[in-house]
């Protein structure tokens, strides 16, 4: 349980003016050589009614003086124990530092608060489980180059590599530069991997400086081709859209080849592409190759327009390939652009293929995008044996079954493809079966079947009329005349057989 004195010490915020030094000492609110202590708010203390400082600064001072009693008071006032430990280390009060450290058992949480390399090292030494490698790694993280310089000879090759990578990832440029200039690093090229990972051009520049000024012989010894390395970096940068990386790399060599530009196209980095297309005289074949890649990569409208502009929107040489890519990658953006810009029509060659395997929803959007009439879609669907599209598109045009029958019948009259015409008639008959037509409409449909030699459908509708006890002799005679006139011999035979039963 807390004593009354401890409760008072913790919670008293205002001391009366008449409180003398003796009473303050008895309450434990007195700091030798400084005077009375008074808590101000949550974060500050007032010393001898005169000086206001933060609780943590007071803790550091008390620790430096080795004043455990004041340290404990300030900790009750919710001060940070880290500052007390730092102060104890600064004042060489090791016993107090160890006593306080025993309450946290992790020196690494304190290190970011320390600026002095000597105190940094002393603080790290509080943790007996840590070694020199751990000290140096943390020193690098917190910009303590002098510690690295002091202990570099005690580090193994693996430790040096780890420290170098930590320095790169922590963006400690001075340490990275010093290590590259003064220590043999097993894999200095890791600096480039990290530079790209962090997209940090300063680190990339340091890497090139080290590569060409300090480790070029080492890299050649490892059979690494510098030009290939630079080209690889250009390709990476292009693929990531890092134009400033590319410009930095080009200061040291390399060339922006078609492979490099392909990376920019593949990931749709138009600004990179635009920058180098303006400055390089590429062959037309190369730009055509980039355009085809852009189609396959589903690049943006701006990227496609950019490449097309360098071809003056002329695609005669790659027309077939564009159609092939449009079908293979199921993209129509290039077709839209060419149609709107130069009225180049690539719709016809792909329409049949698209209708052959795309859904109604997709084709409805396609029809809207290219302002295609439904009649054209339905006829093409008939050619491609897509009855589902015929039904859905015709229903979209005509909601009422009777209107739909009339609409589809008109399409049959203008349909030249034999298989497509037969499918339309088949669809019409199915629609008729699902509808309730009056005899007058059924007569019209029977004549329609006769005109188009649809024997099965004609026989079916005549049977339906007979079941309703409707006299169809005149209809049969009329249709027989149509069949004779058009030389539909099988239909003639069908009509004559039907007449025999009437």
UniProtKB/Swiss-Prot annotation:
Domain of life: Viruses
InterPro entries xrefs: MGF_505
Induction of expression: Expressed in the early phase of the viral replicative cycle.
Family: Belongs to the asfivirus MGF 505 family.
Main function: Plays a role in virus cell tropism, and may be required for efficient virus replication in macrophages.
Full protein name: Protein MGF 505-5R
Organism: African swine fever virus (isolate Tick/Malawi/Lil 20-1/1983)
């Amino acid at each position: 349980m807390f004593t009354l004195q401890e409760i008072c010490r913790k919670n008293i915020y205002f001391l009366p003016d008449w409180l003398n030094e003796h009473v303050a000492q008895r309450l434990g609110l007195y700091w030798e050589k400084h005077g009375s202590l008074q808590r101000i708010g949550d974060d500050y203390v007032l010393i001898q009614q005169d000086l206001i400082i933060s609780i943590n600064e007071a803790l550091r001072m008390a620790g430096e003086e080795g004043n455990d009693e004041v340290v404990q008071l300030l900790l009750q006032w919710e001060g940070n124990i880290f500052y007390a430990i730092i102060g104890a280390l600064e004042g060489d009060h090791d016993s107090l530092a160890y006593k306080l450290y025993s309450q946290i058992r992790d020196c690494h949480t304190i290190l970011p608060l320390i600026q002095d390399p000597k105190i940094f090292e002393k603080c790290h030494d509080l943790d007996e489980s840590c070694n020199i490698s751990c000290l140096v790694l943390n020193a690098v993280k917190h910009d303590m180059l002098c510690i690295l310089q002091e202990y570099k000879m005690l580090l193994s090759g693996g430790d040096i590599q780890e420290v170098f990578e930590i320095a790169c990832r922590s963006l400690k440029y001075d340490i990275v530069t010093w290590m590259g200039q003064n220590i043999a690093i097993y894999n200095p090229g890791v600096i480039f991997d990290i530079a790209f990972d962090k997209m940090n051009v300063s680190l990339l520049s340091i890497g090139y400086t080290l590569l060409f000024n300090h480790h070029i012989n080492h890299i050649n010894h490892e059979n690494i081709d510098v030009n290939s390395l630079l080209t690889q970096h250009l390709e990476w940068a292009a693929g990531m859209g890092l134009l400033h990386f590319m410009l930095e790399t080009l200061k040291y060599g390399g060339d922006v080849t078609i492979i490099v530009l392909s990376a920019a196209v593949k990931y749709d980095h138009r600004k990179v592409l635009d920058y180098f297309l303006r400055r390089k005289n590429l062959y037309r074949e190369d730009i055509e190759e980039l355009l085809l890649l852009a189609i396959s990569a589903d690049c943006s409208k701006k990227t496609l327009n950019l490449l097309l502009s360098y071809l003056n929107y002329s695609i005669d040489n790659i027309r077939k390939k564009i159609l092939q890519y449009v079908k293979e990658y199921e993209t129509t953006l290039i077709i839209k652009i060419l149609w709107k810009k130069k009225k180049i029509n690539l719709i016809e060659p792909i329409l049949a293929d698209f209708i052959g395997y795309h859904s109604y929803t997709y084709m409805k959007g396609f029809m809207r995008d290219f302002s295609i009439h439904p009649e054209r879609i339905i006829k093409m669907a008939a050619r491609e044996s897509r009855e589902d599209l015929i039904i859905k598109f015709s229903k979209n045009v005509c909601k009422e079954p009777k209107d739909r029958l009339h609409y589809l019948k008109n399409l049959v009259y203008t349909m030249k493809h034999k298989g497509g015409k037969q499918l339309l008639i088949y669809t019409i008959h199915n629609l008729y079966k699902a509808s309730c037509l009056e005899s007058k409409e059924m007569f019209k449909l029977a004549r329609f079947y006769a005109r188009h030699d649809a024997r099965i459908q004609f026989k079916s509708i005549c049977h339906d009329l007979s079941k309703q006890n409707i006299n169809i002799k005149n209809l049969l005679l009329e249709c027989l005349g149509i069949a004779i006139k058009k030389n539909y011999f099988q239909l003639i035979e069908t009509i004559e057989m039907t007449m025999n039963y009437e």
